[in-house]
Amino acid sequence: IGLYIAADPHTFDMVELAEQTPFAGSSLAGGLVLAAILIGLAVKTPTVPFHTWLPPAHTDAPAIGSAVLAGVLLKMGTYGFVRIAMPMLPEAWRDWAWVIIVVGIVSVVYGALVALAQTNVKRMVAYTSVNHMGYIVLAVGAAGLIADDTTQARSIAVTGAVTQMVSHGLITGALFLLAGVLQDRAATYDMDSYGGLAGPAPRFAAFFAVGAFASLGLPGLSGFIAEFQIFTGSIAAAPVTAIALVGILLTAALFLRALQRKQLRET
């Protein structure tokens, strides 16, 4: 509504709003409008501290519902950052860039740490969504810091964010469907209830391993391509974003642990 009122002529057309940048030169009003937009998009994405609805939603939803939620619905939040907030409020976005970067870093590390502590495979994958959405927020925040003379780094960061949206949707959607297979066959998501699945269910084990390796960013898979672009662009803008590299190590640890508990450990 704020963008509509400030636009001249009044419009909800996103292309026209991006061309007008209605709050150019008004840092206070632009900052308030951006803050409202960011809170709404942060809930939808979700990022820390607005993430608490996501794990219960995934845990209680059927596998297909979780796949659609992760693959499509969460992307409406991150799409909003790239399509609405950044182009329509560029000055305010630059002013808020460090806040956005910090939220992204916290989401990356926190999501991975909490996922590492889970025994429920579906909740584990749900918390990795917080982790992976954090990478996107980190990238778009870093893009706000990059000056016009480093447009290549800015482009790489934003391209990495968009690639991560697609990659996360495919990978995490697949992992939720595979978790649904476990629930369908054994009526539980508890990883400790399984063991040695690689023997009796080799195809399931192979599919889950591919999904896990893609999610942790193994080179050659889409997760690596997205994260490489994100960090290439982000670290050029703000070296502090390298802290988020810890999230990659934690994600590798949690998925390797899950593979060992479900597929290799003898019961």
Give residue spans per PLM region:
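Predominantly late transmembrane helices and immediately cytosolic-facing juxtamembrane segments
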Residues: 48, 172-178, 241-267
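Juxtamembrane/interfacial segments at transmembrane-helix boundaries in multi-pass membrane proteins
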Residues: 1-51, 56, 81-99, 142-159, ...
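Alpha-helical transmembrane segments and their helix-entry boundary regions
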Residues: 63, 67-68, 124-125, 157-161
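Hydrophobic/aromatic positions within or immediately flanking transmembrane alpha-helices
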Residues: 37, 68, 101, 125-126, ...
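Cytoplasmic/organellar membrane-interface segments at the starts of transmembrane helices
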Residues: 61, 192, 198-204, 255-267
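Small-residue-rich segments of transmembrane alpha-helices in multi-pass membrane proteins
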Residues: 1-2, 63-79, 129-142, 201-211
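Alpha-helical transmembrane segments
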Residues: 27-40, 101-102, 159-174, 238-252
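C-terminal ends of transmembrane helices
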Residues: 45-59, 109-128, 180-183, 259
